[in-house]
């Protein structure tokens, strides 16, 4: 056993204890209740964290030398770190994930951009996209995907990783989970953020044609993933939230179709247009795409409290995002128990020069009051945390407060 294997074997043993703890089954049951719109306390998840700022006592320091071994080591160390400091309601799965090698999977244009980093260690950077769409002929820049799978390569990768962890944890080749259906988030990368809103006034017909092409590209992805049997029915999460449910065949291994899985839709760039334009430019195009799936998570950072009536036109929506920019009380009144409120508490509270725990508590309590008064189930999803100002203890403090507030339900 070489040095890398010794490191991974020890980490796998530690993770196995976490993953086989009874609390994971309890959490699965809670997520199934929440996602089934049954009475349940608010559930908590924490994701998209600034890992480069969080190393405590060397817990996250990589020690393996082999490139593949370091990928496995990184995944195990992060899971163990989260289990130690802020587990929330995360289910720690009893296996190692190894995503299948899928080539040609893209959503239209090849990104051309300039980036600017405030912290060279942070992978969250500013993006300025070079416009590739100014006339109808430029629609050809929005390319259709051609998906390919290298099964022989995946077999070798699986064998290598299985050997690395000495068989202590099973290794699971995973397919496509929580399919992304966000034509506008992809399209803005081709148009450029500087030009985007001018198109609604200056080039509405071109914008509609671009949306139509992006929807066709998305449909092509769905068709190819279905044909090549790449959808994965077992989805632990959807857009940073628990995806466990009794309503989909999550143990299905073959012939998995869109109707067997979750998807998530979003139109963050349309957060500044009117609700009526949201229907015209978003709902009309993505409704036929989203309705092919078993369940839908809708929304991300855009405020949706005044668009619930339009989202209702999409069948199978189960969760609706309420971002920090949403009016949570108005959103809860419109949702009225028909969907899970997926509340995104403000990550800026952890990024300020100083941390105010009472500000965090008030925000979470306001969410829970609004949900309960309107007969809604809700989840508290801390995500998009680009910095904690190198104070990792803030995440543990946020976690403690969230657990206390959820316990008051």
Question: In which residue ranges do the predicted regions lie?
Answer:
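Active-site loop segments of alpha/beta catalytic cores
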Residues: 1-49, 56-61, 65, 89-91, ...
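Membrane helical hairpin/interfacial module
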Residues: 62-112
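A gly/proline- and charged-residue-enriched helix-loop-helix capping module
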Residues: 119-159
């Amino acid at each position: 056993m070489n040095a890398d294997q010794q490191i991974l074997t020890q980490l796998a043993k530690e993770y196995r204890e976490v993953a086989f703890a009874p609390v994971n089954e309890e959490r699965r049951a809670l997520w199934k209740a929440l996602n089934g719109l049954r009475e349940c306390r608010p559930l908590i998840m924490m994701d998209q964290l600034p890992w480069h700022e969080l190393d405590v006592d060397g817990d996250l320091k990589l020690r393996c030398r082999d490139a593949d071994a370091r990928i496995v080591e990184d995944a195990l160390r992060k899971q163990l770190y989260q289990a130690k400091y802020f587990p929330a309601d995360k289910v720690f799965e009893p296996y190692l994930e190894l995503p299948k090698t899928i080539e040609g999977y893209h959503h239209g244009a090849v990104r051309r951009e300039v980036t600017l980093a405030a912290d060279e260690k942070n992978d969250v950077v500013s993006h300025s996209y070079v416009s590739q769409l100014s006339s109808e002929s430029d629609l050809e820049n929005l390319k259709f995907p051609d998906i390919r799978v290298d099964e022989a390569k995946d077999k070798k990768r699986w064998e290598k990783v299985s050997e690395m962890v000495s068989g202590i944890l099973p290794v699971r080749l995973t397919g496509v989970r929580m399919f992304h259906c966000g034509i506008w988030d992809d399209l803005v990368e081709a148009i450029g953020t500087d030009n985007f809103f001018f198109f609604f006034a200056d080039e509405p017909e071109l914008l509609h044609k671009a949306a139509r092409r992006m929807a066709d590209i998305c449909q092509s992805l769905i068709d190819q993933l279905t044909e090549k049997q790449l959808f994965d029915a077992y989805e632990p999460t959807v857009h940073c939230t628990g995806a466990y449910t009794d309503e989909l065949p999550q143990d299905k291994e073959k012939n998995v179709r869109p109707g067997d899985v979750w998807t998530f839709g979003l139109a963050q760039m349309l957060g500044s247009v009117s609700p009526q334009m949201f229907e015209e430019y978003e709902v009309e195009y993505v409704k036929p795409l989203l309705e092919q799936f078993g369940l839908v998570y809708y929304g991300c950072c855009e405020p949706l409290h005044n668009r619930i009536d339009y989202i209702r036109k999409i069948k199978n929506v189960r969760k609706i995002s309420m971002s920090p920019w949403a009016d949570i009380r108005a959103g809860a009144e419109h949702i009225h128990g028909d969907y899970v409120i997926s509340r995104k508490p403000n990550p800026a509270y952890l990024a300020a020069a100083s941390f105010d725990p009472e500000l965090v508590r008030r925000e979470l309590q306001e969410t829970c009051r609004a949900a309960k008064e309107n007969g809604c189930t809700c989840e508290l999803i801390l995500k998009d945390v680009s910095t904690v100002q190198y104070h990792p203890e803030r995440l543990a403090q946020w976690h403690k407060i969230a657990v206390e507030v959820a316990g008051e339900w």
